[in-house]
């Protein structure tokens, strides 16, 4: 299992797989892995040749008074879960890698759905989820996402 921390390294690894026509599966997470994540990883292993798991606590889906700093982070434990489950690549980017400091700001909103469920009392939560998922899917460019 390889642990990569930046987009360029991830793309190099994935290009090797794509040159061999291997099917890439992607399991995006915020870490704190549990049995639900492991079941997704196992399904990805059954379906795909290469499995990528991202571990990124997305600040864009936390409101200003929410507990971003308290969200559990234990890369060592999560990496062990991934290794035991047969993950090929763990992508662990820093915030600057996903949200570089630039003058360009991307915003994605889908009000029909982003105001439902916890979005009704957590303004911007699902906008943040949409944004990070768009970015991660464009970075990993998987054949299948779980």
Regions found by a protein language model. Give the residues of each.
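Nucleotidyltransferase catalytic core that binds NTPs
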Residues: 2-146
């Amino acid at each position: 299992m390889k642990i990569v921390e930046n987009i360029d390294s991830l793309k190099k690894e994935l290009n090797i797989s794509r040159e061999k026509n291997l099917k890439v599966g992607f399991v995006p997470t915020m870490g704190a892995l549990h049995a639900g994540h492991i079941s997704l990883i196992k399904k990805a292993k059954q379906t795909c040749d290469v499995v990528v798991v991202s571990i990124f606590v997305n600040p864009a889906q936390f409101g200003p008074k929410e507990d971003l700093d308290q969200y559990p982070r234990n890369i060592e434990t999560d990496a062990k879960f991934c290794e035991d489950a047969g993950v090929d690549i763990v992508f662990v980017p820093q915030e600057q890698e996903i949200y570089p400091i630039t003058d360009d700001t991307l915003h994605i909103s889908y009000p029909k759905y982003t105001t439902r469920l916890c979005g009704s009392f957590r303004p911007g939560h699902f906008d943040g989820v949409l944004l990070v998922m768009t970015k991660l899917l464009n970075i990993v460019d998987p054949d299948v996402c779980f």
